[in-house]
């Protein structure tokens, strides 16, 4: 029901459910589906856990709970306040991957919901919170653990446009290239 984040050089597991902080990570769940590593039951459970534990009205946060005191050696996320950047912020580029993962599992409505939650044009009614141009993605949006939840930062410094495009075109619209040509399978 949960894919770990990785391992430290000393073999410590990062992102296991018994960790007091950062025990649930977004990217391993998304990529378990995209890579085909997860079987159908594992994929659906991993995606449901993301939706239940990491999703917010602005998109899915990178991990939860944020680091405060317990971080593995070399964890740079701990230098950021809770809810910002790599410390449980909402990284825009990762939204494209969760969109694609949901769509690949046939969850088109949920994939579209993730798209809308983080799409710049859908934020115009919250401009005083977002504080970023309405036509570009920010690198990250402050997550639910931040007092500035919903504020976006670092415009134009992100690969979000391409990952979201892949998530929407190959995922939601279902137009995927394969060895034999173009496969059309909308979610």
Residue spans of the language-model regions?
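Catalytic cores of carbohydrate-active enzymes
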Residues: 1-77, 116, 120-149
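Well-ordered alpha-helical segments within folded domains of soluble proteins
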Residues: 21-36, 43, 47, 88-103, ...
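Non-catalytic C-terminal accessory modules of carbohydrate-active enzymes
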Residues: 52-57, 68, 79-87, 97-187
